[in-house]
């Protein structure tokens, strides 16, 4: 039995976050994100502009066991502190492996997803936008894919907030320009979506 049978290669991009809050107040600090699988972790660059709507667009290649030991991928967001020298946690989200593996998500399929962030008390503190692709293994159709397979991979935007979706389609970075553009994030879909579930209908999509 091959090594690829036990593990799958993933390509995860932590794109951005929206409406970050600390103690229910909009965050103004510089932030970064951390992806965790099992005992391994990968950190993004720091968003130097700071604020509640950071953009990272950092992509990581990683391997994930496909046995029952890993059921979730964790995304954590931290902000830089000026005095203590220790970064503080804003919130985290857990992404079920079943959201991007098996079922109707074949290997090589690029999934754009948005997840609720919650702080240590379980309160909602923002949304994180990610893309996840399970790379085809050597026994599948990997050899037939062009070197730029990321660019031509099938794409599903169904669970991504519409602002990030529009930016991704045009290969652009998205950040709200005025306070009026932040109004729609206040309720995050009426609070009916919880950590670990994609934010399917949190935003009204443009007509």
From Swiss-Prot:
It is a peripheral membrane protein. Residues 1-112 form the C2 domain. It is found in: Membrane. Negative regulator of cell death and defense responses. Exhibits calcium-dependent phospholipid binding properties. Interacts with BON1, BON2 and BON3. Overexpression of BAP2 can suppress defects in bap1 mutants. This is BON1-associated protein 2.
